[in-house]
Amino acid sequence: MNRNFDRKIILEDGTEFYGYGFGAKRDALVELVFNTSMVGYQEILSDPSYTAQAVVMTYPLIGNYGMCNEDYETDRPTISGLVVREFNSEPSNFRAARTLEDVMIQYDIVGIAGVDTRRLARHIRDEGTCKALIVDAQTPSIACLAKMRSTALPTNQVSVVSTKSPWISACANPKHRVVAVDCGIKHNIIRSLNARGCEVTVVPWTVTAEEVMAMHPDGLFISNGPGNPEDAKPVIDLVRALRGKLPIFGICLGHQIIALAYGASTYKLKFGHRGGNHPVKNLQTGKVEITSQNHSYAVKADSLAGTGLTVTHVNLLDGTVEGQKCAADRIFSVQYHPESAPGPQDSAYLFDGFIAMMEGK
């Protein structure tokens, strides 16, 4: 072990990786996942879907361009930790307002650098997503393992990240009124809707069908978010109550929630999909899209039979369901992130499809 290494990350199977700390200096019990994106660490760090998780970045250099005021995906990051090979404390970017470490300290995000992140990512790929503890290097392993065995990871994180009261994101010359259920919505989703002439009313995850309809929306959007979709029962009930009454579009967690509302089921993937280069085939056009993804759960393909939902997109790496629709109810959803941030913009047309649906086309 390098003598300069003052921190370690220990996995629930006892595997240890040593490094040096940056960001917040505290112990952190986390769910450990990995992301293969080369850039976009700021958007990843501020994505509410990573709540209570620590992200292993497989790209070796993180922090090179600092943190830019325009690139946050939430006002207050809720990620627990960041694991990197090397972080840059002196970024070179005219847009940078702060360093990565400054932001991590402000929001109590634990960091560990000097780790062989590609080896760690392979371990997660082979053994699966797991609990991990980031602690001082001298902390006895026996004590760490005992703490992980006795402490459960938090659940129902949607309740943590959702807005507490409705708010409006206006746009010039609005053509449509969209109600967006905030399960952990990213800023660029709202920007993508605003750019297409939608006034967006962002509402808490506990909103009722009656409250939504009282706003007289042209469409309903169900956002991304953290955790198990089965924990989001109020949103499942909302979709069940409003399906067929107005156009509905869901992304990521919203995709899973829609499946559950129709009677399908979901399951947890071994290590999830997180990165900016996942190939997805659009079964309606035959085209392949390169997509940005961040999720632990997926819809069971065989559970869709008899629900009224049909598969529209599939993942070309593992065959999982990436899109679904019920044309009769004017509802559709995708498992990936068409708003990118970070990632490719191959799937931005889905927002246009939502607009067309609200216009009755």
Which residues does each predicted region cover?
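Active-site glycine-centered loops adjacent to acidic/histidine catalytic or metal-binding residues
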Residues: 116, 252, 295, 337
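Cysteine-nucleophile active-site neighborhood
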Residues: 219, 223-290, 296-301, 343-353, ...
